Amino acid sequence: MNDYILFMHHDAAGTDAASDAGLWARYLARLRGTGLFDGGSAIGPGERLRKGTPGRPCDDDLSGFVRVHAESLSAAKELLLPGNPVYEAGGTVELRELPRS
């Protein structure tokens, strides 16, 4: 079983739907029911840091993340449907494997 992270981008045309608490509650309940859910959170403002340069604000392009377990990237993609509010509203969900190193 592999670990994956789904980054929700803040680019959905239907921003109200993408941030609807009721839709998120239903989606997360479904994920919990699969036994594959491993946490998640909204993402707030932050700062980009680089040695020797002043910090600068992060872009406001990420709104949250969800972490899941799945056998493959294809299996992790299936966890978007039905119901990921950002995906359903036409927004971008970035899916990345979290390799064990």
Residue ranges and their predicted role:
Residues 1-101:
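Conserved, structured core segments of small domains
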